[in-house]
């Protein structure tokens, strides 16, 4: 039988090597490239009737007083623009007609170029396909709520797993081990986006937060499947040694985890290649998170649980503090 648990230090080393580049990137400003949801600003999209390049659009926006604008192509002659906040409503003076808003000025100026705009059905139009603005106050609130959501989700997961495995000795360790794997996955995703932001200008937006929360759920679900099989093998009393129980459980669930994840990854890849640009950030988070979540649920969560149960963590802590090693008796499973 394949012995996985004896190689757990190699799995830890592999995870460490995966995490380090992202951690280094996060230490170099800018850590992440935030979208307008977190920095305030305006985003709008439009479709030109004639062939147009991003450099031409950038020049038009620069002439309109927005040299900081970032332009992305979302399709043939289709563009997504992100710039500083543009007023979206007209100003009504005490006397006379309403003054044009910032949006009206930019929209009308761009619509006069390159054959004008086309709507989603391909008909001529004078309006943007999409337009949205986020103020500085709203962007701060979104960032704060996103951080709170991740923290509450982690706490709720720990409590739920601890309660679900309450009949198993040291049930809190199961919950903490799942959170360790979860943090491993989140750190890899955030680190990857930090690197992608520096190289390819990939931004972090609300779709990123949605994807991270989805990855959190997927990672914990996979870990629970492995933990549940460990609990079953422990309860049957057929395996007297805890490392053997963990190893046997991993071999039983590994095929199921890999097959489920591969099916999901193929679906994500299809959407990433054929889907729209608006959800590309979400799909990229899911692609990275599902891949790392499959690995961590098998090789991090269960291995960390075994390391803790075997007393390796207290021994390591004593070694760091310079204390003499304390003998820890072997962990034996209780008879049913």
Predicted regions and their residues:
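A structural signal for conserved, well-ordered secondary-structure elements
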Residues: 1-336
């Amino acid at each position: 039988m394949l012995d996985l648990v004896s190689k757990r230090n190699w799995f830890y080393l592999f995870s460490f090597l995966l995490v380090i580049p992202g951690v280094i990137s996060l230490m170099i400003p800018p850590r992440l490239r935030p979208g307008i949801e977190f920095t305030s600003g305006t985003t709008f999209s439009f479709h030109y009737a004639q062939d147009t390049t991003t450099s031409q659009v950038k020049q038009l926006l620069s002439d309109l007083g927005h040299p900081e604008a970032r332009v992305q192509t979302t399709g043939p002659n289709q563009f997504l623009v992100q710039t500083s906040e543009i007023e979206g409503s007209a100003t009504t003076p005490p006397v006379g007609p309403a003054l044009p808003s910032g949006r009206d000025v930019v929209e009308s100026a761009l619509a006069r170029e390159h054959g004008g705009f086309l709507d989603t059905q391909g008909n001529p139009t004078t309006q943007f396909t999409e337009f949205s603005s986020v103020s500085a106050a709203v962007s701060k609130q979104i960032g704060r709520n996103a951080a709170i959501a991740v923290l509450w989700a982690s706490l709720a997961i720990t409590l739920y797993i601890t309660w679900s495995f309450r009949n198993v000795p040291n049930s809190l360790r199961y919950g903490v081990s799942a959170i360790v794997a979860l943090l491993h996955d989140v750190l890899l995703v955030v680190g990857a986006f930090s690197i992608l932001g520096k190289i390819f200008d990939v931004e972090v937006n609300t779709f990123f937060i949605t994807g991270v929360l989805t990855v959190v759920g997927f990672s914990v679900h996979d870990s629970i499947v492995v933990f549940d099989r460990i609990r079953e093998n422990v309860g049957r009393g057929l395996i007297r040694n805890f490392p053997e129980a963990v190893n046997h459980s991993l071999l039983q669930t590994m095929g199921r985890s890999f097959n489920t994840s591969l099916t999901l990854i193929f679906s994500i890849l299809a959407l990433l290649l054929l889907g729209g640009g608006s959800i590309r950030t979400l799909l990229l988070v899911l692609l990275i998170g599902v891949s790392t979540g499959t690995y961590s649920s098998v090789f991090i969560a269960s291995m960390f649980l075994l390391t803790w149960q075997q007393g390796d963590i207290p021994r390591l802590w004593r070694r760091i503090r310079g204390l003499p090693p304390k003998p820890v008796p072997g962990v034996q499973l209780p008879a049913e």
